[in-house]
């Protein structure tokens, strides 16, 4: 089954990554997880005061809709802490996990 990804890169302007990750987990994750087609969500510290937000969706349309969901959440919750650098929506060729994590 084809999956689709939304990947966004942000500059961290204020605070630290761990604070933002906890806020995203507690506030953004519940919003995304209620959306049709939601598969996975995570954030990663990619260094140089940047972070990456990753969501995986069942359809490309759902991935594209998540761009607007994320934008609204950022505006309402962390607009003073992060600045969007770029967003990508694409088709995920594959995503494999170790049996320990599957």
Region spans (language model):
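Short S/T/G/P-rich N-terminal loop/turn motif that feeds into the first structured element of a domain
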Residues: 1-52, 58-72, 78-102
């Amino acid at each position: 089954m084809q999956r689709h990804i939304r990947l966004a890169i942000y500059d961290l302007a204020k605070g630290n990554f761990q604070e933002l990750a906890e806020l995203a987990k507690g506030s953004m994750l519940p919003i995304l997880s209620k959306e049709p087609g939601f598969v996975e969500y995570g954030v990663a510290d990619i260094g140089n005061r940047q972070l990456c937000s990753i969501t995986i969706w069942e359809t490309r349309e759902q991935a594209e809709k998540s761009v607007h969901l994320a934008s609204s959440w950022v505006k309402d919750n962390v607009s003073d802490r992060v600045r969007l650098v770029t967003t990508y929506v694409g088709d995920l060729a594959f995503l494999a996990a170790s049996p320990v994590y599957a």
